[in-house]
């Protein structure tokens, strides 16, 4: 028997709702804090802001609201979902609100988080929310593996989401250590 999936909770202890918007806030004070926001990637020729960043401090501006789009039903720990910045935007930029993992960045030797993803497609736009032992959550980027390997432990293909410094800004990226510990605050 697999245990019942546990719903992901917001800062008020309420279950996340796919129809609501949330800010992703870092756990930590001062420079360890800071909300996640949509910003322009350096050297990007995209017509819309296409980078996923974190403000440099907890006294910075409020982050860009997101919504979580599960494959079905509610929003549970360890389940694949898409993440979309939930902001009004011009038609051209709609796909530039959906999170995905970019190609390998040679300078950082890892993949950076960007927008331009898809919803419900078997590609690099899937994430999971995993609970930390004490407080808060981590985000994982997970390939859509149900086809590749039916008996593999699912998370072995997932990578933790953390931060690299890009042109003085904190950019979300896949990391081996120091993942970003976050909470979800309803907007």
UniProtKB/Swiss-Prot annotation:
Stated name of the protein: Aspartic protease inhibitor 9
One Pfam family, short name: Kunitz_legume
Glycosylation sites: 19
One Gene Ontology CC term in the entry: vacuole
Site (Reactive bond for chymotrypsin): 111-112
Annotated site residue numbers, Reactive bond for trypsin: 67-68
Species, as recorded: Solanum tuberosum
Post-translational modification, as annotated: Glycosylated.
Superkingdom, taxonomy of origin: Eukaryota
Xref: InterPro entries: Kunitz_inhibitor_STI-like_sf, Prot_inh_Kunz-lg
SUPFAM superfamilies from the UniProt entry: STI-like (SSF50386)
Chief place of localization: other
Gene Ontology MF annotations: aspartic-type endopeptidase inhibitor activity; serine-type endopeptidase inhibitor activity
Disulfide links within the chain: 48-93, 142-158
Gene3D superfamilies per the UniProt record, alphabetical: 2.80.10.50
Compartment(s) of residence: Vacuole
Keyword annotations: Aspartic protease inhibitor, Disulfide bond, Glycoprotein, Protease inhibitor, Serine protease inhibitor, Vacuole
Family: Belongs to the protease inhibitor I3 (leguminous Kunitz-type inhibitor) family.
The keyword Disulfide bond is assigned to this record: yes
Expression tissues: Tubers.
Keyword Glycoprotein: yes
Function field: Inhibitor of cathepsin D (aspartic protease) and trypsin (serine protease). May protect the plant by inhibiting proteases of invading organisms.
